[in-house]
């Protein structure tokens, strides 16, 4: 058969004959072929079919004749081979991997670490399925990324100093919820305290210590002399824990008020030139615009990414000066009339009363919520239509028509979300949560914050009527 080409070359019968022929070969031929240590056969050598000379009566289907050493052993990659090699590893030298790296081990995350199968050599009878031999340090420990490893590393982090978490103050605020329900202890928080708590937690990422701290509760002995009172650092303007209403104002009122005025102009232009809005009578248009101009403006300013900062004013006179500077520049010096001089003071007092810390924080929270959702241009337009066509307003005569407009706007928004291949229910819930925050924004606060330095004592209702009748 040797030296001839047979049609059965490669067939099952040919392989059986060749395997039976190799059993009677001399051992010198096998040793001359390769004198290195056998690591298992990964080639296509045929399995040994005979049972002669096999120790212990091992399963013949798992034994292969290696093409490197010529001996019968399990094939590399087989189940029996993996079990035998894993059983040999605990008895091998463990000092070799330690010389590889001298750094402390943080867990093995590679694919070379084999799980320990047997229980021999494990301290305190640990579960071997969770212990891996690390390729960095050669020790047995939980694998990095496992549940046990996470529990152990989290338990070790409790012993770290308290200065470490301060590095995470600039965390992702958009990953937190903006819901104001169930905040605080069993007594609950008031509306102003709840908004202040939300601002401290989600915007500033810090909490101010209360006055009743550990240092104040420490008893003082009789022989100790009371220390000199130190001046406590003043809390920021948004801290309402003291319960004192502090006067606040815009840090850059001219730039912010001009941006808000431009946003109001774009909002009224968007509403006025809607075909379904133009067919309404003027009185019905006024009912809609006067009730929803502030929420529409908030959506417009959020779309324009308006950023504004507040600052605390130590003296009320300074706040009055900032609120009336813009009007004095446009109208000139005011006459020396007692009644004329009392009017700006009244506006200033109302402004200091309306501009509460919680109200300003509600506006900022709404802006941050919209920015975190990445609302596109069409979604902003459909949200404005949903806010504009509100059939529950008092004084509306065409309620059915307004209901149909609101329903149609919501249907178009639904089609747009599905067209963008988004999860409809999740995206709708996110947009509804943003609209829910508009309920905490007061119209008077928007007027005093963005428009009072410009319009003075003019009513915003008169401004709406004038802008609807004018050609924008």
Curated annotation (Swiss-Prot):
Span list, region Disordered: 214-237, 326-345
InterPro entries, per the entry: NHR-like_dom_sf, NR0B1/2, Nucl_hrmn_rcpt_lig-bd, Nuclear_hrmn_rcpt, Nuclear_receptor_repeat
SMART domains: HOLI (SM00430)
Top-level taxon in the UniProt lineage: Eukaryota
Gene Ontology biological process terms in this record: adrenal gland development; endodermal cell differentiation; gonad development; Leydig cell differentiation; male gonad development; male sex determination; negative regulation of DNA-templated transcription; negative regulation of intracellular steroid hormone receptor signaling pathway
Motif LXXLL motif 1: where in chain: 13-17
MF annotations from Gene Ontology: DNA binding; DNA hairpin binding; double-stranded DNA binding; nuclear receptor binding; protein domain specific binding; protein homodimerization activity; RNA binding; RNA polymerase II-specific DNA-binding transcription factor binding
Keywords in alphabetical order: Cytoplasm, Nucleus, Receptor, Repeat, Repressor, Transcription, Transcription regulation
Main location as per UniProt: nucleus
Residue window of motif AF-2 motif: 463-468
Localization per record: Nucleus; Cytoplasm
UniProt domain NR LBD: residue ranges: 190-471
A GO cellular component annotation in the UniProt record: membrane
Sequence motif: LXXLL motif 3, positions: 148-152
PANTHER family registered for this protein in UniProt: NUCLEAR RECEPTOR SUBFAMILY 0 GROUP B, NUCLEAR RECEPTOR SUBFAMILY 0 GROUP B MEMBER 1
Membership in a protein family: Belongs to the nuclear hormone receptor family. NR0 subfamily.
Subunit composition and interactions: Homodimer. Interacts with NR5A1, NR5A2, NR0B2 and with COPS2. Interacts with ESRRB; represses ESRRB activity at the GATA6 promoter.
Chain's role: Nuclear receptor that lacks a DNA-binding domain and acts as a corepressor that inhibits the transcriptional activity of other nuclear receptors through heterodimeric interactions. Component of a cascade required for the development of the hypothalamic-pituitary-adrenal-gonadal axis. May also have a role in the development of the embryo and in the maintenance of embryonic stem cell pluripotency.
Protein name as annotated: Nuclear receptor subfamily 0 group B member 1
Gene symbol of the encoding locus: Nr0b1
């Amino acid at each position: 058969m040797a030296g001839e080409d047979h049609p059965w070359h490669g067939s099952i019968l040919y392989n059986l004959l060749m395997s039976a022929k190799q059993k009677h070969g001399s051992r010198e031929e096998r040793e001359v072929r390769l004198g290195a240590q056998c690591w298992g056969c990964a080639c296509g050598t045929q399995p040994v079919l005979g049972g002669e000379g096999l120790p212990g009566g091992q399963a013949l289907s798992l034994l292969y004749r290696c093409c490197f050493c010529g001996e019968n052993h399990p094939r590399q990659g087989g189940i029996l081979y993996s079990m035998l090699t894993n059983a040999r590893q605990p008895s091998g030298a463990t000092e070799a991997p330690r010389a590889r790296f001298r750094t402390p081990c943080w867990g093995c995350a590679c694919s070379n670490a084999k799980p320990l199968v047997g229980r021999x050599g494990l301290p305190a009878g640990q579960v071997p399925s969770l212990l891996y031999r690390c390729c960095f340090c050669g020790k047995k420990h939980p694998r990095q990324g496992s549940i046990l490893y996470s529990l152990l590393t989290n338990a070790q982090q409790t012993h770290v100093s308290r200065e470490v978490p301060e590095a995470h103050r600039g965390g992702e605020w958009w990953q937190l919820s903006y819901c104001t329900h169930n905040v605080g202890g069993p007594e609950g928080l008031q509306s102003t305290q709840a908004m202040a708590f939300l601002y401290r937690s989600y915007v500033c990422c810090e909490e101010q210590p209360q006055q009743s701290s550990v240092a104040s509760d420490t008893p003082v002995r009789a022989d100790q002399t009371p220390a000199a009172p130190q001046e406590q650092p003043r809390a920021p303007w948004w801290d309402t824990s003291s319960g004192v209403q502090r006067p606040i104002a815009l840090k850059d009122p001219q730039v912010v008020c001009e941006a808000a005025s431009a946003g109001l102009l774009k909002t009224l232009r968007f509403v006025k030139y809607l075909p379904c809005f133009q067919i309404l009578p003027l009185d019905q248009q006024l009912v809609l615009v006067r009730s929803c101009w502030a929420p529409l403006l908030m959506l417009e300013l959020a779309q324009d990414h308006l950023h504004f900062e507040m600052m605390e004013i130590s003296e009320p006179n300074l706040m009055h000066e900032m609120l009336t500077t813009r009007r004095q520049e446009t109208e000139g010096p005011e006459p020396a009339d007692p009644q004329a001089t009392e009017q700006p003071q009244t506006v200033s007092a109302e402004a200091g009363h309306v501009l509460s810390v919680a109200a300003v924080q509600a506006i900022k929270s709404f802006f941050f919520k919209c920015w975190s959702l990445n609302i596109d241009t069409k979604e902003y337009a459909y949200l404005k239509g949903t806010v504009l066509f509100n059939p529950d307003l008092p004084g509306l005569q065409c309620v059915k028509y307004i209901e149909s407009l609101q329903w149609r706007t919501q249907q178009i928004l639904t089609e747009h979300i599905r067209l963008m291949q988004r999860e409809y229910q999740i995206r709708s819930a996110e947009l509804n949560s943003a609209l829910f925050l508009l309920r905490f924004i007061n119209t008077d606060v928007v007027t005093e914050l963005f428009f009072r330095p410009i319009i003075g004592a003019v009513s915003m209702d008169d401004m709406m009527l004038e802008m609807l009748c004018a050609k924008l």
